[in-house]
Protein backbone atom coordinates (compact mmCIF):
# COMPACT_ATOMS: atom_id res chain seq x y z
CA UNK A 1 0.00 0.00 0.00
CA UNK A 2 1.45 3.35 -0.97
CA UNK A 3 1.75 6.27 1.40
CA UNK A 4 -0.96 8.11 -0.54
CA UNK A 5 -3.36 5.20 -0.08
CA UNK A 6 -2.60 5.11 3.65
CA UNK A 7 -3.33 8.84 3.98
CA UNK A 8 -6.53 8.53 1.95
CA UNK A 9 -7.74 5.61 4.08
CA UNK A 10 -6.97 7.56 7.25
CA UNK A 11 -8.80 10.64 5.96
CA UNK A 12 -11.76 8.51 4.89
CA UNK A 13 -12.00 6.90 8.33
CA UNK A 14 -11.68 10.23 10.15
CA UNK A 15 -14.13 11.91 7.78
CA UNK A 16 -16.74 9.19 8.05
CA UNK A 17 -16.42 9.19 11.84
CA UNK A 18 -16.85 12.96 11.89
CA UNK A 19 -19.89 12.80 9.60
CA UNK A 20 -21.44 10.00 11.67
CA UNK A 21 -20.96 11.94 14.90
CA UNK A 22 -22.17 15.28 13.56
CA UNK A 23 -25.26 13.93 11.80
CA UNK A 24 -26.26 11.61 14.63
CA UNK A 25 -26.20 8.55 12.37
CA UNK A 26 -24.96 6.38 15.24
CA UNK A 27 -27.86 7.34 17.47
CA UNK A 28 -25.61 9.00 20.03
CA UNK A 29 -26.88 12.11 21.72
CA UNK A 30 -23.81 14.24 22.21
CA UNK A 31 -23.95 17.17 24.63
CA UNK A 32 -24.10 20.61 23.06
CA UNK A 33 -20.56 21.43 24.19
CA UNK A 34 -19.23 18.38 22.31
CA UNK A 35 -21.21 19.30 19.20
CA UNK A 36 -19.82 22.83 19.29
CA UNK A 37 -16.29 21.44 19.36
CA UNK A 38 -17.02 18.76 16.77
CA UNK A 39 -18.32 21.01 13.97
CA UNK A 40 -15.16 23.10 13.37
CA UNK A 41 -12.81 20.18 14.10
CA UNK A 42 -11.83 19.57 10.41
CA UNK A 43 -10.80 23.21 10.04
CA UNK A 44 -8.74 23.02 13.23
CA UNK A 45 -7.05 19.84 12.04
CA UNK A 46 -6.29 21.38 8.65
CA UNK A 47 -4.75 24.48 10.23
CA UNK A 48 -2.76 22.31 12.65
CA UNK A 49 -1.44 20.15 9.82
CA UNK A 50 -0.45 23.28 7.89
CA UNK A 51 1.37 24.71 10.91
CA UNK A 52 3.18 21.42 11.43
CA UNK A 53 4.21 21.29 7.76
CA UNK A 54 5.40 24.90 7.82
CA UNK A 55 7.36 24.30 11.01
CA UNK A 56 8.93 21.14 9.63
CA UNK A 57 10.02 22.85 6.41
CA UNK A 58 11.38 25.81 8.36
CA UNK A 59 13.34 23.56 10.71
CA UNK A 60 14.77 21.51 7.84
CA UNK A 61 15.83 24.66 5.98
CA UNK A 62 17.41 26.11 9.12
CA UNK A 63 19.39 22.94 9.85
CA UNK A 64 20.34 22.14 6.24
CA UNK A 65 24.00 21.18 5.95
CA UNK A 66 26.14 22.23 3.02
CA UNK A 67 27.90 19.29 1.44
CA UNK A 68 31.02 20.98 0.08
CA UNK A 69 32.85 17.71 -0.59
CA UNK A 70 29.91 16.32 -2.52
CA UNK A 71 29.60 19.57 -4.47
CA UNK A 72 33.28 19.44 -5.46
CA UNK A 73 32.94 15.79 -6.47
CA UNK A 74 29.87 16.58 -8.56
CA UNK A 75 31.64 19.48 -10.27
CA UNK A 76 34.58 17.23 -11.15
CA UNK A 77 32.20 14.62 -12.56
CA UNK A 78 30.52 17.32 -14.66
CA UNK A 79 33.92 18.40 -16.01
CA UNK A 80 34.80 14.78 -16.83
CA UNK A 81 31.48 14.30 -18.61
CA UNK A 82 31.97 17.50 -20.63
CA UNK A 83 35.48 16.43 -21.60
CA UNK A 84 34.21 13.00 -22.63
CA UNK A 85 31.40 14.50 -24.69
CA UNK A 86 33.80 16.99 -26.30
CA UNK A 87 36.06 14.07 -27.29
CA UNK A 88 33.06 12.47 -28.95
CA UNK A 89 32.36 15.60 -30.95
CA UNK A 90 29.57 17.25 -28.97
CA UNK A 91 29.85 21.02 -28.64
CA UNK A 92 28.26 23.06 -25.90
UniProtKB/Swiss-Prot annotation:
InterPro entries: DPM3. It is found in: Endoplasmic reticulum membrane. It is a multi-pass membrane protein. It comes from the Eukaryota. One of its GO terms (biological process) is dolichol phosphate mannose biosynthetic process. The keyword S-adenosyl-L-methionine does not apply. Stabilizer subunit of the dolichol-phosphate mannose (DPM) synthase complex; tethers catalytic subunit DPM1 to the endoplasmic reticulum. This is Dolichol-phosphate mannosyltransferase subunit 3. It comes from Homo sapiens.
Amino acid sequence: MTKLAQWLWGLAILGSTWVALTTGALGLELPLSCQEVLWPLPAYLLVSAGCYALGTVGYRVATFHDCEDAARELQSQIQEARADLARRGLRF
